[in-house]
Amino acid sequence: MCDEFVLDNGVRVIAEYIPHFPSVSVGLWIGAGSMYETEEENGLSHFVEHMLFKSTQRRTTREIAVEMDAIGGQVNAFTAKECTCYYAKVIAEHLERAVDLLSDLLLGARLDEEDFEKERGVILEEIAMCEDTPEDLVYDLLAEAYFGDHSLSRPILGTHEQIASVSREALVAFRRKHYRPDNTVLAVAGQYDLGSLKEMAQRYLGAWRADGIPQEPVASEGCEGQYITRKKDIEQVHMCLAYPGVGQYDDDLYPMSVMNNLFGGGMSSRLFQRIREEMGAAYSVYS
């Protein structure tokens, strides 16, 4: 059974108490991912994620890195097509320190020009790393082929050209548009006291205010019969196939998940047994 409540500013809080866990995980989920970007904004969700781990009004970049290490905790973030998540895992007694740090990243980031330029270089290297990792690159090509001109077709990292030319002002504007209390979920799992959690949420997130309304992405049905190839000087060919599936609220979601597991979910799956075990044609195959 989960505890759920909403702050006056719209931040939603959902928590699950797990008594046999000595630790607690906490995440701030923002409805900002690459599917919410325009073509000119491509890569900004991920760029913002990087920038929020730079200096804040209360912490230096190093202090952010050291704070969780000092108590044996973990802190990190990721950007997806649908969202960006900032999360931490700590011993239960340090829950407030985790909420304090994550809320400081979210609300207190300085977004300095010097940090912006340094992080631009880091992300350009990350894009180059993806280009050198064909098992990652092939998924970007698959999305490009399947979704065509829709925002879902664009890479989460952005392109080299886009990141090399984007301005700090564009990043600040994107953050202002999408990082809003009514577009945020605070999720907690592990040991916590509900009354204390409500006080923490109000103390660290309750005063947050934002203006404007982010643009919602247009639904996409995908394309038909598209394919993309990219020639690389490597030893193997990496290939992906995509077909229309079902929505997350569709009654067929769970039957399809079971079917997917039978088809390519493990060593006993049909794909693995046929392509690897019987044919010896590939090392890795899955769905």
Give the ranges of each region predicted by the language model.
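A common structural microfeature
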Residues: R12, S23-S25, L44, V48, ...
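Active/ligand-binding-proximal structured segments within catalytic/core domains
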Residues: Y17-M68, D251-F263, L271-I275
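Charge-rich, well-structured scaffold segments of protease-associated domains
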Residues: V6, Y17, T61-E216, T229-R230, ...
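Histidine-centered active-site/metal-ligand motif
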Residues: H46, H50, H150, H238
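A generic structural signal for well-ordered coil/turn residues at beta-strand boundaries
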Residues: M1, P22-V24, E82, C223-E224, ...
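N- or domain-start disorder-to-order transition segments that initiate the globular core
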Residues: M1-S23
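Short proline/glycine- and acidic-rich turn/helix-capping motifs at secondary-structure junctions
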Residues: E216-G225
